[in-house]
């Protein structure tokens, strides 16, 4: 069913991706008319709406790819940070919705060697304007506190591996615990599955 909201989304998607067309969203036949070639028995099988996973959306990367921070990493260059306007707009909408629901927001930047000082400063300004907290794992202060070692804690230049993710998670957990009034639900019956999943995760990853 076409609505004003759906129409606005279609216009934004097609403007951002030239491979997408308005017609294919308004008239699905244009998008799926070749689908008959791909249909198989799996398409007839019912699928659960939710799939349980002990990883909770996390992908642990065991491989180690020795890296080195680029020369001048996170030092001022005078360049202007540019962000996708659509991404910023939707971030603003998400923050506004969270505030409406009484949910505190923390903007988080995870380790990435292509990050820059200017982008970090721009995001910090954006967070201040939105009235939310901002944590940047690429600032020297937090990198030092976390203890990330580019020689062993990275999967590639844009992702930490399993050991790196443990360091990041421990720091972030401590930060959230010390900064916000978060209840500890460990051991509570209503959250028992989380305790079970944690133990299974630790055993699977060898972190136990």
Identify the role of each PLM range.
Residues 1-101, 188-208:
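Secreted/periplasmic serine-hydrolase-like ester/acetyl group-modifying domain
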Residues 94-116:
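Active-site segments of SGNH/GDSL-like serine hydrolases
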């Amino acid at each position: 069913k076409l609505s004003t909201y759906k129409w606005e989304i279609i216009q934004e998607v097609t403007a951002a991706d030239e491979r997408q067309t308005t017609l294919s969203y308004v008239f699905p036949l244009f998008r799926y008319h070749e689908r008959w070639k791909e249909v198989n028995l799996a398409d007839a099988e019912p699928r659960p709406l939710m799939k349980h996973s002990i990883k909770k959306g996390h992908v642990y990367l065991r491989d180690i790819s020795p890296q080195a921070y680029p020369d001048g990493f996170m030092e001022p260059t005078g360049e202007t940070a540019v962000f996708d306007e659509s991404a910023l707009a939707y971030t603003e909408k998400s923050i506004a919705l969270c505030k409406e629901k009484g949910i505190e927001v923390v903007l988080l930047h995870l380790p990435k060697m292509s990050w820059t000082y200017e982008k970090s400063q721009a995001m910090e300004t954006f967070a201040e304007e939105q009235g939310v907290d901002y944590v940047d794992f690429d600032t020297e202060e937090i990198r030092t506190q976390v203890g990330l070692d580019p020689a062993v804690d990275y999967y590639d230049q844009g992702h930490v591996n399993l050991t790196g993710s443990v360091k990041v998670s421990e720091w972030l957990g401590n930060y959230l615990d010390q900064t916000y009034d978060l209840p500890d639900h460990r051991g509570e019956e209503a959250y028992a599955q989380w305790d079970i999943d944690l133990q299974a995760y630790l055993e699977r990853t060898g972190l136990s």
